[in-house]
Amino acid sequence: MLPAYLPNPAAALFGGGTPIDGGRRWSDGRRLLGDGKTWRGLVLGILSGVLLGLIQVSVQDACVFVWLPRHTVLSVLLLAVGALAGDMVKSFVKRRIGKERGAAWPLADQYDLVAGSLLLLLIGDYGFAAVNLTIPVIFWILVLTPLLHRAVNLIGYAIGVKDVPW
């Protein structure tokens, strides 16, 4: 999951610039995604997740890491892209229900990256997903994700990358 965990904070850190939605609005008059989803953030977020995943692939044969899933370039790419795709889908829905950028949306804020990354992994590399997404692995993903999400958001808020601590 490391390639899925890094893209969101990296997108926040390195983002800015042109919004992905180009300022366009849905039929409800609200922005499609908002200013927080930018092309630079998307590209650099995905690249950061892929880079971390490639590092993981290069060291996965070390005896210390034999218990981790044996990632491939494809699984790493799908996890990184899926994490930000899940975040964008959540942002789209968030705008439709009237929540503004930065507004808290418990559970959706924590698990959007999990839903997006695992769904894309299931679609794009079912063999990898079928072997590696065991009940214990899914359990630990569900337990650790909100804890990591909270810690990263507090750090982002403390260093001024995020406007809100959630």
UniProtKB/Swiss-Prot annotation:
**Tell me, what is one Gene Ontology molecular-function annotation carried by this entry?**
CDP-2,3-bis-(O-geranylgeranyl)-sn-glycerol synthase activity
Catalytic activity entry? 2,3-bis-O-(geranylgeranyl)-sn-glycerol 1-phosphate + CTP + H(+) = CDP-2,3-bis-O-(geranylgeranyl)-sn-glycerol + diphosphate
Listed cofactors: Mg(2+)
Q: According to Swiss-Prot or TrEMBL, what is its membrane topology?
A: Multi-pass membrane protein
Function, as annotated: Catalyzes the formation of CDP-2,3-bis-(O-geranylgeranyl)-sn-glycerol (CDP-archaeol) from 2,3-bis-(O-geranylgeranyl)-sn-glycerol 1-phosphate (DGGGP) and CTP. This reaction is the third ether-bond-formation step in the biosynthesis of archaeal membrane lipids.
Protein name, please? Answer: CDP-archaeol synthase
Report the InterPro entries cross-referenced here: CarS, CarS_archaea
UniProt keywords, alphabetically? Cell membrane, Lipid biosynthesis, Lipid metabolism, Magnesium, Membrane, Phospholipid biosynthesis, Phospholipid metabolism, Transferase, Transmembrane, Transmembrane helix
Its Enzyme Commission number? Answer: 2.7.7.67
Q: What is its main location?
A: membrane
Q: Where does the record place it?
A: Cell membrane
Origin organism is Methanosphaerula palustris (strain ATCC BAA-1556 / DSM 19958 / E1-9c)
- What family classification does the UniProt entry report for this protein? Belongs to the CDP-archaeol synthase family.
Instruction: Name one process (GO BP) from the record.
Output: glycerophospholipid biosynthetic process
Give the range the annotation lists for the signal sequence. Answer: none
Which major enzyme category is it? transferase
Q: Which residues, by range, are in coiled-coil regions?
A: none
Cellular compartments per GO CC: plasma membrane
> What parts of the sequence cross the membrane?
42-62, 73-93, 103-123, 128-148
- Its pathway? Membrane lipid metabolism; glycerophospholipid metabolism
